[in-house]
Structure formats: C-alpha cells, structure tokens
Amino acid sequence: MFSNLWHTIKRNWKMSIRAIPSELDYCDVFEFNADKDFYERTYYKFLRYKDNYAVFENLLTQEKKYIFYADLEKLFTEERTIKTYFIYYESIKNLYKILDLVKNKDVEFYISDNRNGLSKTLSFYKIKQNTKVKDNHIKVYFKENDRYYENDLSIYEFPDELTII
C-alpha cells in the first residue's frame, strides 16, 4: 500500500501547491514518519499562504506545519486530498531555511531533540532579522523561563527535525 502511494506521489509531485484554492478547509496528508519509516495519515487544515510557504494545522494536536513550496512533494486531487510527506532536512539546510526567512523579520522556532533514543527535549529560539552566519556560528536567543538569552550556536548543532512557529 505504501509503495503504491509513493509511486503516486512521485508521478504527481511537480504540481504546484498554489493549485490549492484559498477556500480549502481540510485535507488528508500522508506524512512520512522518519522514526517508524512509513507513511501515516494525518488530517490537516490548510490555513493560509505566507511568503514562500504554506501553513497547515494538525486537527488533533493544533500543531502548525510550515511547508516551503519548493520542497513540498504533493498531489492535489478533486477530493481535496494532498498526499505528501514533510521533508526532514539535514541540519545545515534547516538553518539556511530559517535564514532565508529572517531577511524580512525575526523568526521564532523550536527544536525538538530526540537523539540517541533519549526522551524528547524542546528548546525555543529566536533569530533576529538579517542575521548572518559567521565562522559557522549564528547568534540566537534561547528562551528560558519566559526570557530570551543571547547565545552563539554552531550551524552543526541544528538537528534534523525543526519546526518554525
């Protein structure tokens, strides 16, 4: 079943996400789960277009997904079903995606870290507008007890999975 789905995605992935009409309310999303190595069906609500990405909301958890047009593998059908998976980038690519956004404004995001089978920890960060990478480090502000503290973060410390909020 999942291999058939993958062939369907590959055959149709060049369709533009902009084909989704603004009045679209709900859609099915087949999301690739990297931990379990298979696709699982998730229900998302399409919220809006913003800059160079689209915003979806998970109907069960209210978690928001920010999906870049250029990176979304998708299929849009008459039944308003999007068969896709959200790509988990390599660490350095995550950072440059964020830097692309901070040209115009501050960006707040969190990193969910689940390395070496340890329990997940959630770290909140903010990157200021027009931030640049210098000597493989970037100036970030991490949130602790509702306050932000300045810190330098190596671009190689970014994990594979990252969510912008």
Language-model features: where?
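Basic/aromatic-rich interaction segments and small domains that mediate binding to polyanionic partners
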Residues: 38-66, 129-149
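Terminal low-complexity interaction tails
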Residues: 1-7, 11, 20, 131-165
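Short beta-rich binding modules
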Residues: 87, 94-95, 111-142, 160-161
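Mixed-charge, Lys/Arg-rich low-complexity intrinsically disordered regions
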Residues: 2-25, 84-101
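Short coil-to-beta transition motif at edge beta-strands of beta-rich domains
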Residues: 18-37, 99-112
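Intrinsically disordered, low-complexity, charged/polar segments
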Residues: 61-93, 146-165
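Short coil-to-beta-strand transition motifs
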Residues: 34-43, 117-123
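Short, exposed beta-strand/loop patches in secreted or surface proteins that constitute
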Residues: 21-23, 45-48, 98-102, 127-132, ...
